[in-house]
């Protein structure tokens, strides 16, 4: 496997959220209480990481539209702001959102890697220092099967060598089995 970094042009705005969601994204202008809430979550996650060099946190929710993707982004930003080299993976290959939120192409995303269509792991750097994104890639017909194959283990082992922390945004756990594929591969679920 090879890691390919795709840099954003500085003239582009990285994040293209709806106005409502923009107010929810962690930034310098966020209210103190919001910053403090994510700092508290970050501290709790750091204490729960079992001494791992690169913890992997899987973010899910019981049902759709509970804000898990916004929380995934904010937790990843919180770790990146602390100086941790952070990778945010869009593990929702059924309804991917991170490529739209960050306006990045889906080439060589998670689905292509797990299907064996590429050996290149193409991550996109963001305007947030220390934060990179691996998109879900093109929507496959069989996400659960892809996540259950040995390439998932190889991918996670590979990214653990290059990052300090990994967050995986997954689909709702009560709707599909995809999030459970990470049970033995992750530090924990959020």
Where are these regions (language model features)?
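P-loop NTP-binding module
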Residues: 1-190
């Amino acid at each position: 496997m090879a890691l390919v970094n795709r840099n954003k042009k500085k003239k582009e705005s990285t994040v293209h959220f709806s106005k409502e969601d923009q107010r929810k994204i962690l930034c310098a202008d966020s209210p103190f209480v919001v910053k403090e809430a994510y700092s508290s979550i970050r501290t709790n996650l750091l204490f729960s990481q079992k001494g791992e060099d690169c913890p992997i946190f899987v973010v899910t929710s019981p049902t759709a539209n509970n804000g898990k993707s916004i929380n995934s982004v904010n937790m990843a930003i919180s770790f990146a702001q602390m100086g941790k080299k952070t990778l945010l993976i869009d593990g929702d290959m059924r309804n991917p959102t991170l490529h739209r939120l960050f306006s990045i192409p889906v080439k060589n995303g998670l689905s292509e890697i797990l299907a064996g269509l590429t050996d290149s792991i193409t991550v996109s750097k963001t305007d947030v220092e220390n934060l990179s994104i691996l998109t879900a890639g093109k929507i496959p017909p069989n996400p659960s099967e892809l996540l259950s194959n040995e390439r998932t283990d190889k991918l996670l082992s590979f990214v653990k060598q290059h990052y300090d922390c990994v967050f995986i945004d997954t689909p709702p756990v009560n709707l599909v089995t995809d999030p459970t594929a990470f049970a033995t591969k992750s530090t924990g679920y959020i």
